[in-house]
């Protein structure tokens, strides 16, 4: 009798312990389900976009809209982190980070691309672009010139997904640049590009290469007395504070390039690539639609400062400057040899194809 009682007690104890273990295991599973990320969240990818511009510029607007559209296309499975205002370094540093896989996208102008594929430098020749914004936009994104150059860029593990011209550039200066002769001896800040330097040597100026981040202080200290940039850049970077004149010239335009690495791009499947391209198209058109309002606002604020006089370049003087600037073509042709002549011919054909009839 005593033996049966002990057996029964032991059995009940074992059953109770087993039941406690089951309950504990169930509680642990519930706890872990809250502690660990969901399967969907664990698959979320983080992509970084970096650029050098400030709020109020077309580049900034494009990047923010691109973030919105990519995240929408991927239904929240991708998180886009945007690093504006040169937070991740210079254009060249960001481009290198893309090449080496530390950054998914960057939005530089064509200037840093020219350092590895010189043929892109044609975009920096003064007065070579159409005076019609959408002609340039279509020629860059649909024309044969950039397809041809893209094959060279891919050898450097880079791929341009979208070309987005900024608004046309103007000159800011401490002297009123109203005619060709005014450029003689002018200390103008330029991006450190062989072609851009050649542009101003053709005008008998004294081009002075200065990093973008140092332009304001260089103008303030008279290391340079002039520079070129779109109106919204002149405003957002406060260059007008240290310049007496802004001259509306429309002689060139910085061209933003949504750039990624071939390695990253090829890691995406076709459907994912199409999603990114759709997002880029929408973001570009959104940025373009807002450009006129931004330009007007920036111009009005510069005028309201009372510090800077806005001047227009007379059509006749623009023609004289354009003619004098053709001397810079020889530098491009010498630098790029046969490819240079081919690119210039292709670009002219693209402008004719997409130009206003």
Locate the predicted segments by residue:
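Short, low-complexity disordered leader/linker segments with a strong preference
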Residues: 1-46, 356-357
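N-terminal secretory/targeting leader peptides
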Residues: 41-136, 144, 151-357
């Amino acid at each position: 009798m005593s033996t049966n009682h002990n057996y029964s007690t032991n059995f009940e104890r074992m059953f109770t312990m087993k039941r406690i273990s089951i309950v504990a295991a169930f509680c642990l599973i519930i706890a872990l389900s809250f502690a660990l990320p969901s399967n969907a969240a664990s698959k979320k990818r983080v992509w970084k976009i970096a650029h050098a511009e400030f709020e109020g510029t077309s580049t900034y607007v494009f990047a923010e809209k691109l973030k919105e559209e990519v995240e929408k296309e991927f239904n929240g499975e991708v998180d886009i982190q945007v690093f504006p205002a040169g937070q991740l370094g210079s254009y060249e540093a960001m481009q290198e980070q893309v090449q080496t896989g530390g950054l998914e996208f960057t939005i530089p102008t064509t200037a840093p691309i020219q350092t590895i594929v010189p043929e892109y430098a044609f975009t920096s020749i003064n007065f070579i672009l159409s005076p019609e914004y959408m002609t340039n936009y279509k020629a860059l994104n649909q024309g044969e010139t950039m397809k041809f150059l893209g094959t060279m860029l891919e050898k450097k593990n880079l791929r341009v997904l979208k070309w987005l011209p900024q608004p046309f550039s103007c000159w800011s200066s401490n002297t009123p640049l109203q005619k060709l002769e005014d450029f003689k001896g002018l200390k103008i800040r330029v991006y450190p590009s062989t072609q851009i330097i050649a542009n101003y040597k053709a005008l008998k100026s004294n081009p002075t290469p200065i990093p973008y981040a140092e332009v304001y202080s260089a103008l303030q200290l008279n290391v340079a007395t002039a520079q070129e940039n779109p109106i919204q850049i002149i405003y957002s970077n406060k260059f007008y504070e240290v310049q007496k004149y802004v001259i509306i010239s429309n002689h060139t335009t910085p061209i933003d390039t949504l750039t990624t690495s071939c390695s990253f791009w090829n890691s995406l499947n076709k459907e994912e690539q199409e999603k990114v391209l759709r997002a880029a198209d929408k973001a570009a058109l959104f940025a373009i639609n807002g450009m006129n309002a931004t330009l007007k606002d920036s111009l009005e604020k510069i005028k309201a400062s009372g510090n800077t006089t806005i001047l227009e370049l007379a059509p006749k003087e623009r023609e004289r400057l354009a003619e004098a600037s053709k001397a810079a073509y020889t530098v491009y042709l010498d630098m790029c040899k046969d490819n240079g002549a081919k690119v210039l011919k292709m670009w002219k054909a693209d402008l004719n194809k997409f130009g206003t009839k």
